A protein has these predicted regions:
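Hydrophobic, repeat-rich solenoid/adaptor surfaces of innate immune receptors and signaling proteins
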Residues: 48, 102, 142-144
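Cytochrome P450 heme-thiolate "Cys pocket" and heme-binding signature region
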Residues: 72-102, 127-130
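Amphipathic alpha-helical interaction motifs in eukaryotic regulatory proteins
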Residues: 8-12, 65, 86, 103-111
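C-terminal helix/juxtamembrane-tail motif
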Residues: 131-149
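Cytochrome P450 heme-binding "Cys pocket" and the immediately downstream C-terminal segment
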Residues: 97-132
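Conserved cytochrome P450 K-helix E-x-x-R motif and the immediately C-terminal K′/meander segment
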Residues: 1-35
Length: 149
């Protein structure tokens, strides 16, 4: 289960459901050592996709590597470097349910099936620029074959 958790987190790092998190400043904030201030009430868009693809935070960000989520690696990163469900008091209320439901579904499939990418899937993947959420151009098509016991 631990590796499945790392796998799931890496998928959401590379392909978060939404590319940004919206917030509103609850008070004035001035960046240390500058005169730059975000005023109370200012609407902010936090670029989760950009943060989670930043090579300074995640070396080789285009590489799929579930080990980015081992305990030591997570402890070494800023807690706001991973935002697939937002964070704080306004984070996604269904995040835990969605994660558990997805993991149970994955286990149910891979337990008795082999999963391959279908030839209809375009590789390398391209993002669909017309999609509001992160989606791949042409979709992802899979071939699922039942494995004999």
């Amino acid at each position: 289960m631990k590796y499945l958790d790392k796998f799931f987190k890496e998928v959401l790092r590379m392909y978060p459901l939404v590319p940004f998190v919206m917030r509103e400043a609850s008070e004035n904030y001035t960046f240390k050592g500058t005169k730059v201030t975000i005023e109370k009430g200012t609407k902010l868009w936090v670029p989760a996709y950009g943060i989670q693809r930043d090579a300074n935070i995640y070396p080789e960000p285009e590489k799929f590597d579930p080990e980015r989520f081992n305990d030591d690696a997570v402890a070494a990163r800023h807690p706001m470097a991973y935002l697939p469900f937002g964070d704080g008091p306004r984070n996604c209320i269904g995040s835990r349910f969605a994660q558990y439901e997805s993991k149970v579904g994955i286990i149910a499939i891979i337990r008795n099936h082999k999963v391959d990418v279908c030839e209809k899937t375009k590789i390398p993947y391209e993002s669909d620029p017309r999609s509001f959420m992160l989606a791949l151009k042409g979709g992802v098509h899979l071939k699922i074959t039942k494995v004999k016991n």
